[in-house]
Amino acid sequence: LLMCNLCFADICFTSASIPTNLVNIQTKNKVITYEGCISQVYFFILFGVLDNFLLAVMAYDRYVAICHPLHYTVIMNRRLCGLLVLGSWVTTALNSLLQSSMALRLSFCTDLKIPHFVCELNQLVLLACNDTFPNDMVMYFAAVLLGGGPLAGILYSYSKIVSSIRAISSSQGKYKAFSTCASHLSVVSLFYSTLLGVYLSSSFTQNSHSTARASVMYSVVTPMLNPFIYSLRNKDLMGALRRLFRRKP
């Protein structure tokens, strides 16, 4: 259930921007309507934050599997998983609706040129002509609560996981426990490192093109890599990859 929702969120996250960009490249038309831009803002926030929430839920799932293996099926039952996924969807949908609705109050002086490959809310706020203080406050609190909250949960879960793995006496047991969460840890590291890269790029450079290129990583590359990273645990896929690389030309 968790994996299906994460894969669905990743597909929708990339679909929020790639189809429009492909059409623009084909038609050589870089214009997007106001309604289309607000729609991109809504879905971009929705599935981006949903990714964050689902990664936190999956971190808790790994924590229960490693730290409380005998109670795993009792704790992580289908009802709890369903409630966690539903809560993630409802919270992110309400947040996305609030922020995109707040974007409707922004006014722009002339035809707007966004130095980005997708309509991101922070770019719209920077280019607005009217008072953006309410938008800034909403974005700030959303980043702290909906971004920092799941991250804190992930860090806490992995601190407990590391402590449990260190307490295992056999090296084989440690390897088996680590392999249980290796894929999730790789996805989390990739997700937050690309977000950090975008933040640092926008903070220390004034070049909008470099910021746009950096944002491609977390909005396109990372969601496309996530299913592949998780599928590496599939023995059939690993066997096929080994046969492919061993095949002589």
Curated annotation (Swiss-Prot):
Disulfide bonds join 37-119. Belongs to the G-protein coupled receptor 1 family. Residues 10-40, 104-136, 201-210 are extracellular. GO terms for molecular function: G protein-coupled receptor activity; olfactory receptor activity. The keyword Transmembrane applies. The keyword rRNA-binding does not apply. Tongue specific. It holds the Pfam family 7tm_4. SUPFAM superfamilies: Family A G protein-coupled receptor-like. It comes from the Eukaryota. It is a multi-pass membrane protein. InterPro entries: GPCR_Rhodpsn, GPCR_Rhodpsn_7TM, Olfact_rcpt. This is Olfactory receptor 1571. Possible taste receptor. The chain crosses the membrane at residues 1-9, 41-60, 83-103, 137-158, 181-200, 211-232. Its main location: membrane. The lineage of its organism: Eukaryota, Metazoa, Chordata, Craniata, Vertebrata. Keywords: Cell membrane, Disulfide bond, G-protein coupled receptor, Glycoprotein, Membrane, Olfaction, Receptor, Sensory transduction, Transducer, Transmembrane, Transmembrane helix. Residues 61-82, 159-180, 233-249 are cytoplasmic. GO terms for biological process: signal transduction. It is found in: Cell membrane. It comes from Rattus norvegicus (Rat). Glycans are attached at residue 130. GO terms for cellular component: plasma membrane.
